[in-house]
Amino acid sequence: MDIKTLKGFKDYLPKDSLIRIHIVRQIFSVLNSYNFDLIDTPVLEYSDLLLKKSGDETEKQIYRFKDNGGRDVSMRFDLTVPFARFVATNISALKLPFRRSQFGKVFRGENSQKGRYREFMQFDFDIVGEDTFRGDAEILSVVYYGLEEIFLNFIEGINKKFIIHYSHIGILNSFFEKLGLKEKSIFILRNIDKIDKIGIDKVKEALLLEIEKEAVDSILSLVSLQGTFKDKIQALKSILGDNESIKRVEDVFQHLSLLKIQDSFNLNLKISRGLDYYTGIVFESEVFGSNMGSVCSGGRYDNLVSSFSNSIQKISGVGGSFGVDRIKDIIDLEKFSYIKIFVTKARSKVLIVNLDSALQNYYYELATRFRNHDYSKVKNISCEVYFKNKNGKNIKEQIEYALSKEIRFLVFVGQEEYKENKMKVRDLTKKEELLLSFEESINLIKCNEKLLCTPF
């Protein structure tokens, strides 16, 4: 029997899992600074709920089946639709505006390739109950600071640059209506969203199947506008006149300028996201040189929550989603030797080398002291005792074990050290060994914490 994972699904070894969890922690730290509240929703939902606003492409990719009770269920393809259902279900318990964060796995039957899997992790963030441009700008600022935290602070030795492309569905729909193509808007939006994926020529071919050539040329000309933000806005105003959606985009840009982060944003009318529930601002983010597609995408959805219940009035929402596994793939592509452990405080790792069978109990008592020396638990040191079987293990094998787990400090206690209430501490990054008391050992390990790196 060939033992392997399903196509598009993968195992994560400890090193891979370490990178993933630190990406999650970096994103969480940014969202926490904005007061987003963490929630969770089921992986399985009723199919009719998930498919309400999914679009034809998504419907083809969804994992859908009958459960043992004969119910038509599907695995979530994103975290946005389940969140809208969550709001509709729990509206009486929520204080609006509600800031939500959530991370978890989602499932899509896509063509699997690097950066595109059938099971992958997302970290979402949304604000519901807020329909002003400030909400849009707040979400876009989260995207900026989240990517900055990951790519400019998390990774040592590289300075990854990124750009956040954004558009507005209202601007595009206004133009389609001007062309007399209002009823074709969803068809057009789904196709122009593919321009960067399959090229403008193939998109043009698809549009010509249902739309006259003159209109197609006008659409492709609009979404290909070049120049500065001001140039594009002036061009749009000359075409659409006094337009509410254009004003919205201007207000968002002014807010981003207030934060002095506007240079990382690009008004790009090719962005439409291809999902039927978006109604306003939409965005995608690109890491230069990665060729991985968007690492954080999203937009405004004003009608999604109310579509789940007739008793709920319109509740506006806007949000985005970080692609954790795609971000990890970009990190994997980089040629660097170390990844800094940043989170809140890097935890030092210690291995107590098993030297003497007569000191087994003492080793475990010592490990407990390392783990619990700080009452607040914030500055404790992760530590383990090497398991010694009946055949024993020599010191070389124990050191190799420490290196394989990227443990930095080895602690040696033989009979002589035990009698003196001392220990030898070896720093594997410096190849130095010192005879120290327990408190001195703690100080040595903690003082080196700021420089702690995990070799890969």
Curated annotation (Swiss-Prot):
<dbReference type="GO" id="GO:0004821">
    <property type="term" value="F:histidine-tRNA ligase activity"/>
</dbReference>
<keyword id="KW-0067">ATP-binding</keyword>
<keyword id="KW-0030">Aminoacyl-tRNA synthetase</keyword>
<comment type="subunit">
    <text>Homodimer.</text>
</comment>
<dbReference type="InterPro" id="IPR036621">
    <property type="entry name" value="Anticodon-bd_dom_sf"/>
</dbReference>
<dbReference type="InterPro" id="IPR006195">
    <property type="entry name" value="aa-tRNA-synth_II"/>
</dbReference>
<keyword id="KW-0547">Nucleotide-binding</keyword>
<keyword id="KW-0648">Protein biosynthesis</keyword>
<dbReference type="GO" id="GO:0005524">
    <property type="term" value="F:ATP binding"/>
</dbReference>
<dbReference type="InterPro" id="IPR015807">
    <property type="entry name" value="His-tRNA-ligase"/>
</dbReference>
<dbReference type="InterPro" id="IPR033656">
    <property type="entry name" value="HisRS_anticodon"/>
</dbReference>
<dbReference type="GO" id="GO:0006427">
    <property type="term" value="P:histidyl-tRNA aminoacylation"/>
</dbReference>
<dbReference type="InterPro" id="IPR045864">
    <property type="entry name" value="aa-tRNA-synth_II/BPL/LPL"/>
</dbReference>
<dbReference type="InterPro" id="IPR004516">
    <property type="entry name" value="HisRS/HisZ"/>
</dbReference>
<dbReference type="InterPro" id="IPR041715">
    <property type="entry name" value="HisRS-like_core"/>
</dbReference>
<comment type="similarity">
    <text>Belongs to the class-II aminoacyl-tRNA synthetase family.</text>
</comment>
<dbReference type="Pfam" id="PF03129">
    <property type="entry name" value="HGTP_anticodon"/>
</dbReference>
<dbReference type="GO" id="GO:0005737">
    <property type="term" value="C:cytoplasm"/>
</dbReference>
<keyword id="KW-0436">Ligase</keyword>
<protein>
    <recommendedName>
        <fullName>Histidine--tRNA ligase</fullName>
        <ecNumber>6.1.1.21</ecNumber>
    </recommendedName>
</protein>
<dbReference type="Pfam" id="PF13393">
    <property type="entry name" value="tRNA-synt_His"/>
</dbReference>
<keyword id="KW-0963">Cytoplasm</keyword>
<dbReference type="InterPro" id="IPR004154">
    <property type="entry name" value="Anticodon-bd"/>
</dbReference>
